[in-house]
Amino acid sequence: MPKKLLLALSISILSVFSLNAQTVVGKYAGEFMALGVGGRALGMGGAFVAIANDVTAGYYNPAGLANLNYPQISLMHSEQFGNLVNYDYGAVAIPFGADLSFGISIMRLGVDGIPDTREALVDPSGTVVYDITDPRNRINPSLITEFSNQDWAFYLTFAKRHTDNFYWGANVKIIRRDIAEYSATGIGFDIGALYSPLDNLYLGANVQDVTTTLVAWNTGRNELVSPTLKIGAAYRIVEILGGYIMPAVDFDVRFENRRFASYGSLGPVSFDAHAGFEYNYNNLFSVRAGYNDVKQFTVGAGVKLPKLNLDYSFARFSESEIERLPDSHRISLILTLEEPRFMRDIF
């Protein structure tokens, strides 16, 4: 069986069977929101909590939207696992007054064309049956239909400049999940902060799903997305080879009992890390590299044009070529409406 079809069938089987279980679970319930956004940040291994100085801050650290002096728009598209999974992202942010910013971000993760064999098993007489243990029963290809699995997340972001070196912000998240005839909705909250204690040193923190996010399925099943604490630091080293280099590191603390799936764990608490750097030459182009929380090596590059930033990132798992999943390529753009009439009001 082709690898793509096998993966699609696995997703559908696991999803459908899990939806019928009337239990409350928390592990990996919000994993689709952990994929990261933006070619710039992803090229740095996702180490962006302390940087977060563009429109993608609505995802990485809501406080970072306070950095904006002009409105920004961002778009990203990615096809993962051999083009089986489509991942799209879009965001808009605007500065307001002297110290506020507002934004909206949308993420969609989708698998289309999943074979649905639930009504395709027939007995020797051609009657649809559901007994998979009877070796005489066979799949009738003409009865196989298709369905989609879609996960959506909508972020509404508020950010404020509290002082010149301290910003804070918050997200309201609305979640929508669909698989075949099943659907779920949820709402959650994030809070974040940015602090620069010294010139060129940046510290950040973001508590995702701070109140624990409830995702309720129409089957009666409820999933809880546990809080995740993300903390990070970045330092900008200026005047190197005509530009600057900025190393960054993030640490994720989760409370989902992930154990061996993480870099380290202590009881139900798990720890993951992101590390990366960016070299920017004269604010014209950038090169990046990093290592993320799912053990992928990442590289990337970016070009700054008038009012437009184009960024690309590449990620590869560290396993051997035979064992690892396909590579990921992501391209994103950021449009900055850098005109006097759109500039933040400075009183």
What residue spans do the PLM features occupy?
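Subset of outer-membrane beta-barrel
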Residues: 22-347
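Bacterial N-terminal signal peptides
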Residues: 8-16
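Bacterial N-terminal signal peptides that target proteins for export
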Residues: 1-9
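Sec/Tat signal peptide C-region and signal peptidase I cleavage site
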Residues: 17-21
